[in-house]
Amino acid sequence: HVVNIACQTCHIPTYSKEVATKTWWDWSTSGDDNRNIVRDKYGNPLYVKNKGDMRFGKNIAPEYAWFETGKAVNYVRGQKIMDPNKILTIAGPTSTIKDNKARIYPFKVMRGKQAFDAKYNYLLAVQLIGDNGYWSTFDWKKSAETAMKASGLPFSGEVDFIETEMYWRINHMVSEAKDSLDCLDCHGDSGRMKWKELGY
């Protein structure tokens, strides 16, 4: 197993053990005056006007993927979005089972929806504070226009939203040895590994 599986995979069976962590952030639903702040069982807001819908979790089982240092996708500002109807991976591993040096690692995957330019097909920079800031105007066009001018990239004035994801490799929150994963946690009938997605 040590050849194909990172130490963290077995020794960090869950993350955010003590404090809930945000797992979803949908900017597209923000700005609604007709919705009230709703909180989850941990006391975290599930909806706030200036941020939109959010979800939180605690003691979460990681998601797993092949990872090799130096092999990852990282979205760069201005990079074209090839298909706005598909989930855009902003940061994540690109290794597969065929990469000899890759191992299966645990990840927190942060998902949500972000603003993008529907004509130029790239993510938008958005100013949040200040006179034209979104949190003052709740006007995506104004706030994006100001921020995009500062970024040096053209802005068409057409704002839409795309679902995004970011993979964050988990290295901390190691559990005691007695709480680490055992064989059936992965290989049992209800094991946590998605073997087909991992290439098996």
Residue ranges and their predicted role:
Residues 1-200:
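C-type cytochrome heme-c attachment and multiheme electron-transfer modules
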